């Protein structure tokens, strides 16, 4: 009886279906070349780990730098690539970015600049790129403290890849916004970099489990005075 059970288990293992396409979509290699989506990304039709996803972040990269011009300023750039998987995901082509801009100019300001975006669609076997026009970008006053950068990517439908980039300049160099490693959409790749001079002290905190950092310990950079 034991031999029969082992034989049956072995046969069931051999007859179990294999899903190579599912494994492929679940393990897409990160393609971080902004402006150059891969054929694999363009041909992607679903996301195996979450088949209900209407869209997915292929990547979201950020980089903060400190610049000096009559005082320090903090700049933070964003590069984003999203794949639209279902018609309901088209709404992610409408982007809103709030930023601090009080009506009292003496309080310091943030501003958004270097805004660009485009969409990619496969048509007759060719990748068609459609850049975002200037008219699609607007700035709206939300309240006496915040403005909102708004823009809409063109020619978006099921199967489209959208990309966009923007840069925030802030007078509040001592305050770095939290970086979200996961959003409401599945995130395939997320990276944040911070470059700062040695005269500025930063403490790095990574709450949560399973985050990969270049150093296991919490870092506290020392200040060097001249």
Q: Where do the model's predicted regions map?
A:
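Bacterial Sec-dependent N-terminal signal peptides
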Residues: 1-26
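Beta-strand-rich, non-transmembrane domain signature
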Residues: 21-226
């Amino acid at each position: 009886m034991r031999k029969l059970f082992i034989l049956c288990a072995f046969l069931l293992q051999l007859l179990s279906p294999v899903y190579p396409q599912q494994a492929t979509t679940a393990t897409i290699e990160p393609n971080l070349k902004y402006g150059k989506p891969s054929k694999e990304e363009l041909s992607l039709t679903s996301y195996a780990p979450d088949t209900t996803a209407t869209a997915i972040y292929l990547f979201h990269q950020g980089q903060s730098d400190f610049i000096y011009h009559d005082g320090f300023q903090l700049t933070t750039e964003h590069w984003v690539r999203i794949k639209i998987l279902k018609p309901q995901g088209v709404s992610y082509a409408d982007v809103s970015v709030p930023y601090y801009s009080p009506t009292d100019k003496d309080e310091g300001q943030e501003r958004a600049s270097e805004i660009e975006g485009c969409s990619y669609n496969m048509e007759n076997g060719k990748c068609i790129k459609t850049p975002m026009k200037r008219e699609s970008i607007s700035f709206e006053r939300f309240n006496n403290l915040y403005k909102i950068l708004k823009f809409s990517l063109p020619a978006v439908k099921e199967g489209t890849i959208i990309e966009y980039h923007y840069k925030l300049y802030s007078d509040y160099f001592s305050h770095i916004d939290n970086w979200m490693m996961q959003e409401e959409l599945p995130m395939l790749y997320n990276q944040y970099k911070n470059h700062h001079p040695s005269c500025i002290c930063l403490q790095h905190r990574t709450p949560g489990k399973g985050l990969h950092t270049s150093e296991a310990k919490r870092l506290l950079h020392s200040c060097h005075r001249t």
